[in-house]
Amino acid sequence: MGPAIVRIGRGPSTRYGLAAPIGDLGHAWPLYLIDPRGAPREIGVLHSLAGPAWWLEMAPGAAWQSLTATDFPDAIFPGLPWFLDDLRPQGFLGRSFARRHAARLGVDSDPTNWSERAVAESLLKFGGDLPGAFVVGAESLAAALQPTEESIPADLRPEVYPRLATEALAGGLPRSSAGGEQPKFTAIVAKSDGPESVIVKFSPPLETPEGRRWADLLAAEAIAAEILRTAGFATAPTEWIDAGGRRFLEVARFDRTRNGGRTPFVSLLTHDAAFFGEMNTPWSDAAERLRSKGWLEAMDADRLVALWRFGRLIANTDMHYGNAALLLNDRPPLRLAPLYDMLPMAYRPGLENTIPALSEEMLARAQSAASPERNLALSFWQAVTESRHVSDSFRSIAEAHEKSLRQRP
């Protein structure tokens, strides 16, 4: 028996494609969106086609125009649909996810070597707790609706987090896949106002030079988030804890709600790759593209520009498109997601764990800045200078940056 024929569309625009089954999982699966209350809604059926290509057959009444927009009016995608691309295993947690499931998928343990079909199979079999709110297939939905892991009492974090860090470094945590290379794990913490889903970054041992520097940077990340939050920017709430000889930075997840719900989002990287293909340009350029094409309202576009300017003034050399995100609506405009990963990455330890000294290049950047975010950056460096939680060497760096910003005419 040959491959099944898939009818695409209706009326004069009807087209036909060949189904492309994935293993014994078939070629069509429901696509669910879990809402902020934790209730799933089927928004369509995802078809795997020969080519390869993918077709999203929208459910009646599920008018998610933002998923197809002008570039994909027939909801046919040349690869895995762009709004699912952030579900690929990536970063520190993604590699851990891949190591756990590679044998059952029959693929290499390095997810960068996975084919698109392997990625799709992982979404269908193990996609119950991935970033965002989309879930593909009934098997992963059943996993998504299982009772969540037991919450960690807030007062027990100093005891539990060091153990989870050890397990994460060993690749033994069966938790959510999220991007980024900084060692981390995910958890649910029982806070006074309810359970909170968090991503927890952690430093190497504080007794090492690289551990001390990463501890400085994690403190700086929390300070930057607070400075920006006070100025009216949406940032993910943070809290740091020193325990077990490490520093832990707890960052609230904006894609999870307190009552077990989820919020759909895509990284700026994924969105730009799908609609513009200019991912190597600054955030400020992305903001203008998003504004001009109606993907962001002017206020959010201006905020993205402001965050980019602020990042340059605090020596953040890692503002790639994976470090900004957009909250999905059923139709444009989208919304800028709360900020995360804003810290002075110019001062992170090098590949050989060398510890960077004061960067004259970063100081010169501050000297030439005329942006309104200069005062925010000044507040940031002043707060770092005054913090009791940074090392003397990093305090000296902060003092130099503060002085440089104050001296600018």
Question: What are the roles of these predicted feature ranges?
Answer:
Residues G2-P409:
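Phosphate/dinucleotide-binding and metal-coordinating scaffold of catalytic cores
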